[in-house]
Amino acid sequence: AGILSRKFNIPIYANELTWKAMEKSLGKIKEENIKIMPKRSTMSLNDLDITSFNTPHDSVASTGYTIKHKGKSASIATDIGTFTEEILRNIRESEVILLESNHDVQMVKFGPYPYELKRRVLSEVGHLSNEDCGKAIVDIMKHDKHRKIILGHLSNTNNVPELAEQAVINVLNAHKINIGKDLELKLADRHKPSSY
């Protein structure tokens, strides 16, 4: 972010705690390009309204966002160890939602990570599993709106796109949520921008 800001003279937006945590690693940023967005707030940027909300993760002031434009909205919620009421309240009206589907629990348990990292990933301030992502989508779908859901932040070590998708589909099928009719489900590519 620091390199982009310096090269293209663009601002960096972050809440105060996140800014303080990353300030040294960014390098020198022009004062006018330092933009503090208070936690749990809404700000307008041109014709976009951007709302931040807390996400339970073991990083400094982890945050998700909902962006509204001309009556439409999109949300991003990653780095969430637990799907909370605050997250649901902030994303349930969005037409497009990028939601974390980070790992398969068994792959974490039997994978190469050291014990402490496994415990961290699986904790309530770690990352959302594929099954918990499916359960979160069930909660989102209780709000009667056709949505596009993008599964994102898939672990390279503890997940496989097909496994993430199938785990979520299994949960949705168990709750009689019809993919294609009730919602569109996509996977974000790990290494390139989505065409969604």
Where are these regions (language model features)?
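Active-site HxH/HxHxD metal-binding segment of metal-dependent hydrolases
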Residues: A1-S41
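Short active-site oxyanion
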Residues: K7-I12, S73-A74, L183-E184
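Active-site metal-binding loops of divalent metal-dependent hydrolases
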Residues: L17, T55-D58, T78-I80, S101-H103, ...
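Short, charged, surface-exposed secondary-structure boundary motifs
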Residues: M22-S25, L45-D47, S62-T63, M107-F110
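Core dinuclear metal-dependent hydrolase active-site scaffold
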Residues: P38-V96, Y196
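Cap/insert and terminal regions of metallo-dependent hydrolase folds
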Residues: E85-K186
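Short, basic/aromatic-enriched C-terminal tail that caps enzymatic domains
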Residues: L183-Y196
